[in-house]
Amino acid sequence: MTAGKQHINKSLLYEGRVVSNSMNKTVVILVETRKTHPKFKKIVRRSVRLKVHDEKNECVVGDKILAIETRPLSKEKRHRLYKIVEKAK
């Protein structure tokens, strides 16, 4: 799968790497996207950090995961763990 956003059943899927798992049932992932700048036509990398709900605390730092958009779970959490694509080495 390609990095960034994808759709499944009208929900957005985000693919990113786990950068923090110090919270209980929550991981922070870094999602990187590439866009072409409208004026300068240069490819620019953008990144965003998302807080993702991990019910079983199964993610570790370095894992590549898919997160799906969901209802608000807390003040900053709006995504759930959908699938672990690749475990950290």
UniProtKB/Swiss-Prot annotation:
GO function terms (MF aspect) = rRNA binding; structural constituent of ribosome
Which family, according to UniProt?
Belongs to the universal ribosomal protein uS17 family.
For this protein, the record's SUPFAM superfamilies field holds: Nucleic acid-binding proteins (SSF50249)
Cross-referenced HAMAP family, in alphabetical order? Answer: Ribosomal_uS17_B
Q: Which UniProt keywords apply?
A: Ribonucleoprotein, Ribosomal protein, RNA-binding, rRNA-binding
UniProt entry tagged with the keyword Methyltransferase? no
According to UniProt, the name of this protein is Small ribosomal subunit protein uS17
Q: Give the PANTHER family listed for this entry.
A: 40S RIBOSOMAL PROTEIN S11 FAMILY MEMBER (PTHR10744), SMALL RIBOSOMAL SUBUNIT PROTEIN US17M (PTHR10744:SF1)
**GO BP:** translation
Q: List, alphabetically, the GO terms of the cellular component aspect.
A: cytosolic small ribosomal subunit
